[in-house]
């Protein structure tokens, strides 16, 4: 591996600013690393070397003339394949969009380009972001760099694996029910799900519009802080975008007097995850924090509520992919109805079809009130329960995932078990609050374990402060693999 990629994110940012390395050198190192290990990891669906190197060359020219766009000018970043980049294929890892080239940039892409970031698309994902393992991609299964027989998490598995394998220092993903936090946990990274509405969704191909949110990955907390500061902000093109106070610097917590909400561990949780969680809690208690065990019994139905709402929105959002408005066309008989059926049957994978059917059922005339209407009422109760929690505690700490990375193929035939991987993440999306996954050590096999920190709406600054303090605790650092494959 090129020595440049052994530098931390902070060192890379400093080296670019001081001229110790050029953007072209850094981009070339990333390309070489991708060629070296991605045959095994399969984090990227394509690699446009010319476009990457051209962007890096432009960055170098700006720095040489003394006019860098920002301190980030020349920094490479991987982009998930559901975030639109003009004149680049945005397939959402689906055959139905296999040849779709976006005619416009997503808002987050415009913001990254305005700061001089070097974009490296297209990071693999579960098809249309529907999955928790990146096994639902129509093109390839991404592997966990820590163990190639295991999954990296999903749906943003390609983004997470690319950072964990040191192919890129940063990445963007999307999080609908845990799709940034869960792969961050399984790949030993920091992964942020911002408050809903603080980051524009314009140009993010929608899965479930009331739940989707774009978020960053990094090996270091500072990478997430920097990316959030760049991509957040109100956007008139996104009707759900909000004005928010932002933050000037991460809040520095004093553990003495800090009230931290915790969750009771059960026998269903991997013992090593429980051990790591309790170790963190004990360290926080020793530093003066007060631990408050919260009653999460009302969240037992969070996953079914999530899957009713998410699949309902998915069935609506994906109706546009019919072979006429969007998507590849399969016209065997010349009949309009057959065109719709054939295009969608051949274009969508099995998990996408399953969720479309579930959503269509819950929205049907005879069942709308019983399912979708009831789920929306229950969603309000979840939001109120979080409000109640945060009147008692400053933060809530939970393991991000109940297990470390499982083996490829282990849960593909049991969707219920796969859905349970998001047991602690979906409720955060239902409530629209921010959460971040931070590394919490490893299990006996060396597989990463993640800790989810949750805060009230718009409290990203405090969330980063808590993540910074917890990240400084003993024995939580992750050693990332260099020799892969």
UniProtKB/Swiss-Prot annotation:
Signal peptide: none
Reactions that this protein is recorded to catalyse: L-glutamyl-tRNA(Gln) + L-glutamine + ATP + H2O = L-glutaminyl-tRNA(Gln) + L-glutamate + ADP + phosphate + H(+)
Active site: 80, 155, 179
GO cellular component: glutamyl-tRNA(Gln) amidotransferase complex
Keyword Nucleotide-binding: yes
One Pfam family it belongs to: Amidase
Protein keywords: ATP-binding, Ligase, Nucleotide-binding, Protein biosynthesis
Catalytic class of the enzyme: ligase
Gene3D superfamilies associated with the record: Amidase signature (AS) domain
GO BP terms: translation
GO molecular function: ATP binding; glutaminyl-tRNA synthase (glutamine-hydrolyzing) activity
EC number: 6.3.5.7
HAMAP family: GatA
Entry similarity comment: Belongs to the amidase family. GatA subfamily.
Function: Allows the formation of correctly charged Gln-tRNA(Gln) through the transamidation of misacylated Glu-tRNA(Gln) in organisms which lack glutaminyl-tRNA synthetase. The reaction takes place in the presence of glutamine and ATP through an activated gamma-phospho-Glu-tRNA(Gln).
Subunit structure: Heterotrimer of A, B and C subunits.
Descriptive protein name: Glutamyl-tRNA(Gln) amidotransferase subunit A
Organism: Leptospira borgpetersenii serovar Hardjo-bovis (strain JB197)
Lineage: Bacteria, Pseudomonadati, Spirochaetota, Spirochaetia, Leptospirales
């Amino acid at each position: 591996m090129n020595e440049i990629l052994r530098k931390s994110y902070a060192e890379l940012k400093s080296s670019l600013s001081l001229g110790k390395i050029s953007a072209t050198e850094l981009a070339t190192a990333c390309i070489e690393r991708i060629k070296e290990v991605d045959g095994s990891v399969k984090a990227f669906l394509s690699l446009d070397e010319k476009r990457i190197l051209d962007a890096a060359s432009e960055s170098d020219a700006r720095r040489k003339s003394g006019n860098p766009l920002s301190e980030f000018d020349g920094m490479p970043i991987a982009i998930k394949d559901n975030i639109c980049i003009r004149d680049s294929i945005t397939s959402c890892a689906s055959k139905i969009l296999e040849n779709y080239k976006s005619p416009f940039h997503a808002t987050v892409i415009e913001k990254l380009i305005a700061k001089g970031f070097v974009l490296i698309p297209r990071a693999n994902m579960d098809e249309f972001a529907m999955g928790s393992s990146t096994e639902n991609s129509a093109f390839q299964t991404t592997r966990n760099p820590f163990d190639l027989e295991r999954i990296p998490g999903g749906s943003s598995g390609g983004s997470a694996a690319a950072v964990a394998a040191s192919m890129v220092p940063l990445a963007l993903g999307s999080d609908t029910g845990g799709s940034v936090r869960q792969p961050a946990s399984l790949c030993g990274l920091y992964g942020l799900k911002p408050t809903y509405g603080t980051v524009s969704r314009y140009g993010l191909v929608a899965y479930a519009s009331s739940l989707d949110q774009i978020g960053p990955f990094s090996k270091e907390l500072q990478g997430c802080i920097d990316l959030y500061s760049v991509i957040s902000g109100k956007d008139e093109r996104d009707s759900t975008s909000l004005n928010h106070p932002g933050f000037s610097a991460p809040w520095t917590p004093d553990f003495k007097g800090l009230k931290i909400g915790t969750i009771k561990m059960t026998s269903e949780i991997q013992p090593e995850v429980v051990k790591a969680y309790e170790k963190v809690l004990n360290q926080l208690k020793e530093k003066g924090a007060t631990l408050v065990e919260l009653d999460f019994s009302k969240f037992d139905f969070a996953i079914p509520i999530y899957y009713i709402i998410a699949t309902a929105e998915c069935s609506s959002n994906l109706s546009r992919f019919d072979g006429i408005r969007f998507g590849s066309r399969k016209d065997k008989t010349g009949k309009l109805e057959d065109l719709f059926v054939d295009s969608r049957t051949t274009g969508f994978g099995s998990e996408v079809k399953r969720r479309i059917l579930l959503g269509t059922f819950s929205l049907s005339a005879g069942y709308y009130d019983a399912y979708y209407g009831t789920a929306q009422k229950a969603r309000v109760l979840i939001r109120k329960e979080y409000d109640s929690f945060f009147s008692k505690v400053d933060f809530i700490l939970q393991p991000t995932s109940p297990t470390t990375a499982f083996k490829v193929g282990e849960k593909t035939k049991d969707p219920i078990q796969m859905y349970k991987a998001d047991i602690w993440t979906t409720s955060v999306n239902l409530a629209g609050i921010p959460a971040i996954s931070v590394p919490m050590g490893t299990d006996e096999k060396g597989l990463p374990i993640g800790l989810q920190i949750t805060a009230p709406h718009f409290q990203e600054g405090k969330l980063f402060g808590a993540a910074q303090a917890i990240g400084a605790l003993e024995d939580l650092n992750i050693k990332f693999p260099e020799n892969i494959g």
